[in-house]
Amino acid sequence: MAINALMLSSSRVGNTPYLEHAIEFIKPLSQNTKKWLFIPYAGVSVSHDAYLSMVQQGLADLSLEITSIHQSEDPKQAIRDADGIFVGGGNTFQLLNMLYQHDVLALIREQVQAGKPYVGWSAGSNITGLSIRTTNDMPIVEPPSFNALNLLPFQLNPHYSNYQAPGHNGETRAQRLLEFTVVDPLTPVIAIQEGTALWRQGDSLRLVGNKEGYLFHGKQQEVPLAAGSDLSSYL
């Protein structure tokens, strides 16, 4: 497979402007790919037009032509015509549900497996794994299935942080991911912190950014993955 896919943990790091930190990660995928299609379906409290404008402004330094799938009367043809695909963050359940509604999930997978560059952040990264069972989001809608793009043969958990506020008695993120590994001990979960990403190029997978990631797999819990690690063995 000639997959060239970038899975960003988040659209921001700290108080930095929208997508600013991601430009250096996206640049290698965009040098020969100028016509991009944005998929804004994860946005719930923002209009598709406003979301598109945010992305266009955030990535203006890359001088790309970015249109949105919602502007096309034929979403499938819009995907075929694009040189690359951006999928934004928001609610992962809403995103996956709309991809199923428009019957484009399989087409996106096919196009990316054939070499079309893919960049997702947050929810747009969540859907690149086997399923969305390790998303952080509230299930505000019910997709026909939790099965996702399967561009990566494991589960993702973006925005990873195991911080627990003093006096707060809810589960930590690590505890929630432990629950997943109890019911599905054979499927790995790779958790990535804000400011980092996974970059798959064919049979190569690397953790990019300056923070470590974490592996949850069966009895292996919150195992650190060094920044810059080669994670190709998980493909």
From Swiss-Prot:
Major localisation: cytoplasm
Keyword Protein transport: no
Subcellular location: Cytoplasm
Database matches in InterPro entries: Class_I_gatase-like (IPR029062), Peptidase_S51 (IPR005320), Peptidase_S51_dipeptidase-E (IPR023172)
GO biological process, one term: proteolysis
Lineage: superkingdom: Bacteria
Presence of keyword Glycosyltransferase: no
Ranges in coiled-coil conformation: none
GO CC terms, sorted: cytoplasm
CDD domains: GAT1_Peptidase_E
Active site: residue positions: S122, D137, H159
SUPFAM superfamilies: Class I glutamine amidotransferase-like
Catalytic activity as recorded in UniProt: Dipeptidase E catalyzes the hydrolysis of dipeptides Asp-|-Xaa. It does not act on peptides with N-terminal Glu, Asn or Gln, nor does it cleave isoaspartyl peptides
An annotated Gene Ontology molecular function: dipeptidase activity
Top class in the EC scheme: hydrolase
Transmembrane segments: none
Swiss-Prot/TrEMBL keywords: Cytoplasm, Dipeptidase, Hydrolase, Protease, Serine protease
EC number: 3.4.13.21
Family per record: Belongs to the peptidase S51 family.
Role: Hydrolyzes dipeptides containing N-terminal aspartate residues. May play a role in allowing the cell to use peptide aspartate to spare carbon otherwise required for the synthesis of the aspartate family of amino acids.
Protein name, as recorded: Peptidase E
